[in-house]
């Protein structure tokens, strides 16, 4: 019988509301991890419990809509008329922007989704408007904007929705959705641990630099003075 355990996720964001007003300004639903805006300030909960489920008969049980382990395993109709935009912040460094293009290429090959475009929120092209237009040109009737951000902040609450709405004004009959950022997803635990282990192996001389660090000479041990 599948057992259920819980772990505590601590989140804080001081740029939009003080912690003293946190619980007064927002209502947190433990089952959906959604935050309801009740005044003009956005805030995140100081802490909340997230359910975690183990495997049962070879597949994962459906977990929380925001943080469940089963995210991405239940298909919900991504088809030929859907376009996906993966948007990051954008950088003045060309190398950083090229990494998003490489990630989008990997994502498209892995998922088989026909319409996937990269976009940068600012500082670089293609913009969200550019990517939205490319999706529509390829036949998309619904555009899914996926922020390549770890946690929700001003860019997710305000900037990306505003830029996407402006892009959508150019077209009629096109719907769009802005998904949640990555958040404390269970799969990210493995990603972070893998990165740590690889970099430790590199500084010990047992592994080459990863693609992110390659040529930067950043992945090395520093000694405090």
UniProtKB/Swiss-Prot annotation:
Keywords of this entry: 4Fe-4S, Chloroplast, Iron, Iron-sulfur, Lyase, Metal-binding, Plastid, Porphyrin biosynthesis, Transit peptide
EC annotation from Swiss-Prot or TrEMBL: 4.99.1.4
Result after altering residue 210 to A: Impairs [4Fe-4S] cluster binding. No effect on enzymatic activity
Binding positions for Fe cation per the UniProt entry: 89, 155
Disruption phenotype: Post-germination growth arrest.
UniProt binding sites for [4Fe-4S] cluster 1: 199, 210
InterPro entries in UniProt: CbiX-like, Sirohydro_Cobaltochel/CbiX
GO biological process: response to oxidative stress; siroheme biosynthetic process
UniProt GO cellular component terms: chloroplast
Transit peptide: 1-46
Reaction equations catalysed: siroheme + 2 H(+) = sirohydrochlorin + Fe(2+)
Pathways per UniProt: Porphyrin-containing compound metabolism; siroheme biosynthesis; siroheme from sirohydrochlorin: step 1/1
Highest rank taxon of the organism: Eukaryota
Effect of residue 199 to A: Impairs [4Fe-4S] cluster binding. No effect on enzymatic activity
Entry annotated with the keyword Plastid: yes
Subunit-structure text: Homodimer.
Role this protein plays: Chelates iron to the siroheme precursor. Catalyzes the last step of the siroheme biosynthesis. Unlike its counterparts in bacteria, contains an [Fe-S] cluster which is not involved directly in the enzymatic reaction, but may play regulatory role in iron, sulfur and tetrapyrrole metabolism. The [Fe-S] cluster is required for normal plant growth.
Protein name from the UniProt record: Sirohydrochlorin ferrochelatase, chloroplastic
Species assigned in the record: Arabidopsis thaliana (Mouse-ear cress)
Gene assigned in the entry: SIRB
